Each structure stands twice: as structure tokens, then as C-alpha cells.
Design a protein with these regions (language model features):
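Catalytic cores of carbohydrate-active enzymes
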Residues: 1-99
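Non-catalytic C-terminal accessory modules of carbohydrate-active enzymes
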Residues: 63-201
Length: 201
């Protein structure tokens, strides 16, 4: 018996953001998926928002991801603050789930998305022996973070201006790091502590 697939015109936000992580195969077009995701907004649960945000950063759509982190409608983390939650909600608002609890870890996606994706700090090897530092600030002009690891804190500050990009990073002495900078168009100079350096593209 041959396996076949039924075609359909239906597409869901959930199906699309999952596909960014699994890259289904020949014919799959990332930009088409990202374009569709942008038409749906936060049409997923608080739980699903974790996977949506990961997919946006994985697809290098940091600008839309920043928009989703900072938007203020009723399907937003801002709304959780506005309605009086001091932690994170089980659902976006009481109108979506009147019996929700107001102390729900699955609503706290920004707590890991900001350090891992926006600031771009992730372990490349076990125990953070080597870290990857790859900020994706999009139009955010400034960010600062202290990110704890088992080897000590990584401290970062990023200035992201039209004509200058400055990344200050301090890592523990027992850690190595691969540091990524955005590649600007046109002529540019990269310096490390004021000394020009060659850049691997």
C-alpha cells in the first residue's frame, strides 16, 4: 500500500511555526511560512507562544519577534501586567479562560526568549564550556543583561544604532565563546578593545 498525502488549503499558525524547527523537506519555503505567521499575530495559546517565539528567531525574523514581545493588545505579556498579574497567567486573559490560574510558568516564555534569543546566549557545549553569543535586537537600540550559567555570569551590553553597533561582553575565565555580530551592508570596521580585527563571514 502506498502512502499518500491529502492536500488542503487550510493552514494553521501552529502547523507553520512547528515547520520552522523541523524543515519538512524539498519544496518547503521558509519565507512563505514566515509571511503566513505574520498574518496570524498571537493566534496561539500562552503555551504555544514559546514555540512561536522560538520559530521567529530561528527564522531570523527578529523584528517581528520583538513586536510580539512588546505588543500591548489582550494577547500579550503586557496585558498580563495590565490586568494585575504579578507572575504570568495560564491564558492570555480571563475572557479566554475564566477559571485560569495566575501563577503559571508556561506563560513566562519571555523569561527564556530574551536571554536565549534576543540577547542570543546559548550553550554550544555541555555545561557552557563554550557559549554562543548571537544577539538579535532588530530595531531595539539598547539592551543589557546578566545571564547566569553554571560557570558564572555572562554580562552583556549592546548598542544598536544606525551607524554603530557596540557589543560589550564579559564571560567567566573558564568559558570560551563564539561571538556573532550582524553583517552591515557597505563598508565597516570591526574592532576588539579598539584594535581592528578580521571577521569570518
Amino acid at each position: 500500500m502506498a502512502l499518500g498525502f491529502r492536500t488542503t488549503d487550510h493552514a494553521s499558525l501552529h502547523g507553520q511555526y512547528v515547520s520552522v524547527g523541523v524543515r519538512p523537506g524539498p519544496g518547503w519555503k521558509k519565507q512563505n511560512v514566515v509571511d503566513f505567521i505574520q498574518t496570524r499575530g498571537m493566534a496561539c495559546s500562552v503555551y504555544g507562544s514559546q514555540f512561536l517565539m522560538d520559530a521567529l528567531y530561528e527564522a531570523n525574523d527578529a523584528e517581528y519577534a520583538l513586536h510580539m514581545l512588546t505588543k500591548t493588545d489582550d494577547r500579550s505579556w503586557y496585558n498580563m501586567i495590565r490586568v494585575g498579574s504579578t507572575i504570568s497567567l495560564e491564558a492570555w486573559d480571563n475572557k479566554y479562560k475564566p477559571n485560569q490560574d495566575w501563577n503559571h510558568a508556561w506563560g513566562a516564555a519571555p523569561a527564556n526568549i530574551i536571554p536565549r534569543r534576543l540577547m542570543g546566549v546559548e550553550p554550544l557545549t555541555p555545561g557552557f564550556a563554550t557559549a554562543r553569543i548571537k544577539p538579535q535586537l532588530a530595531s531595539l537600540e539598547w539592551a543589557e543583561a546578566t545571564i547566569p550559567t553554571i560557570r558564572g555570569a555572562i554580562r552583556m551590553e549592546v548598542e544598536n544604532k544606525a551607524d554603530t553597533y557596540v557589543l560589550r561582553v564579559t564571560i567567566p575565565a573558564n568559558m570560551d565563546a563564539e561571538v556573532y555580530l550582524p553583517l552591515p551592508s557597505g563598508k565597516y570596521t570591526v574592532t576588539n578593545n579598539g584594535v581592528p580585527v578580521k571577521v569570518a563571514k
